[in-house]
Design a protein with these regions (language model features):
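Radical SAM enzyme [4Fe-4S]-AdoMet core and its adjacent flexible, acidic
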Residues: 1-13, 178-291, 300-305, 311-317
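Conserved alpha-helical substructure of the radical SAM core
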Residues: 2-156, 161
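A generic "binding-loop/recognition-motif" signal
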Residues: 72, 173, 310-313
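Short, flexible helix/strand-to-coil boundary loops that buttress conserved ligand/catalytic motifs
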Residues: 80-83, 154, 181, 308, ...
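A short, flexible beta-alpha/helix-coil linker loop
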Residues: 84-88, 173-175, 241-244
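Radical SAM/AdoMet-radical enzyme domain recognition
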Residues: 98-118, 124-237
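Accessory C-terminal segments flanking Radical SAM cores
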Residues: 271-363
Length: 363
């Protein structure tokens, strides 16, 4: 990765480019054109709101990550959520209600949040929450989904509410995807991607990056396939070891160096997709972006956490506001510590720091 790479500028330019291209392609679609024009204006208003808070000494991140359910219809190999008991098919946890999420999204819009990533579990299992998100058209909601529940009814909701942007999980080719997510998954999700492309729905892809699939998913053939299916963004997310014996699947320094060079090449080429690496791109943003520096995570029960891979919390959104959560004791201590500061090698800065984080929570 070139030393002068500006991740924030790249993402902003990429989103603006996608909106511009989508506008050009949607001149015969008044519904989509109206949304894109409205969102472009809303993004400017959100930036102004964040600037006003900054003038008062309060930093507002433009991103949130919200895990809206702990249930999932798949049992993927090496799933971090299941291995850490964050995914619960019995649905015994006291999840935030649809009304709770509506309030949180309202607050996010008021303080200037522009993007809210919806995850799970499988977020398509919480249609009521998706309907709440759809009403906040000034926020773009990338929905990280396994892609198997995109029924006609769900696609109709997305088609009518273009601020919901599906990000479909795919692990590489058919063999690699089905090996992790179950037989037949690849054919189902690629068919659903084709259906979204036919409807002109904006969507992307998410790849869990491992030592086994890195060559495939960064190769020309795979990326050309994603473009042909209509994907406009590709997220590369480092595999976090969930099960004993899978440590060798986690990208090391060699893989991260390779990915950085490959993304540098791709980002310099004229392309219809934008590329995001997590957490690798953080090393070009003056350290880890968690705990409100660039984003924070809300778990399905309302806990405000530094990031999805740091499941510790001392504040719950069921009982407090987003603004208050940003100044929680944990987040404040973490931002003042050296755990987030400075550049890191690309590996998750907080993974494996359970004792330090627990101490900051007073546990």
């Amino acid at each position: 990765m070139s030393a002068g790479f500006d991740l924030d500028r790249y993402l902003t330019d990429g989103v603006e480019s996608i909106v511009k291209d989508a506008l050009a392609a949607s001149l015969k679609n008044p519904k989509e054109t109206a949304f894109l024009l409205s969102y472009a204006l809303a993004s400017k208003r959100a930036a102004s709101a964040r600037e006003k808070f900054a003038a008062e000494g309060k930093h507002i991140p433009s991103f949130l990550i919200a895990s809206i359910t702990n249930r999932c219809n798949l049992h993927c190999a090496g799933c971090y959520a299941r291995a850490n008991s964050l995914c619960d098919d019995a649905d015994t946890a006291q999840l935030l209600t649809d009304e709770d999420w509506c309030r949180i999204f309202d607050e996010a819009a008021q303080i200037g949040v522009s993007f809210c990533l919806l995850a799970g579990g499988e977020p398509m299992l919480r249609r009521g929450v998706l309907e709440c998100a759809a009403k906040r058209r000034e926020i773009l909601f990338p929905v990280f989904t396994n892609g198997t529940l995109l029924s006609e009814n769900m696609l109709e909701l997305i088609d009518q509410n273009r601020n919901l942007v599906p990000i479909v999980s795919i692990e590489g080719d058919e063999r690699q995807t089905d090996a992790r997510r179950g037989a037949g998954t690849y054919q189902k999700l690629t068919a659903n991607m084709e259906r979204m492309h036919e409807k002109g729905i904006l969507f992307g892809a998410s790849v869990t990056l491992t030592t086994e699939n890195i060559q495939t998913v960064t190769g020309d053939a795979f990326l050309s396939m994603l473009r042909a299916l209509g994907a406009k963004v590709a997220f590369f997310v480092d595999y976090v070891p969930a099960d004993a014996g899978t440590e060798t699947l986690a990208p090391g320094d060699a893989e991260r160096d390779f990915l950085a060079r490959r993304l540098d090449e791709l980002r310099k080429e004229p392309d219809s997709m934008i590329y995001v690496s997590f957490p690798g791109d953080e090393q070009f943003s003056d350290g880890c972006l968690a705990a409100g520096r660039g984003f924070f995570h809300i778990n399905p029960t309302g806990g405000a956490e530094p990031c999805p891979f740091s499941p510790v919390s001392d504040t719950n959104l069921k009982h407090t506001s987003l603004l208050a959560a940003l100044d929680s004791p944990l987040f404040s201590r973490l931002r003042a510590s050296e755990l987030l500061s400075g550049h890191h090698t690309g590996a998750c800065a907080l993974f494996g720091k359970d004792e330090e984080l627990a101490a900051m929570c007073g546990k």
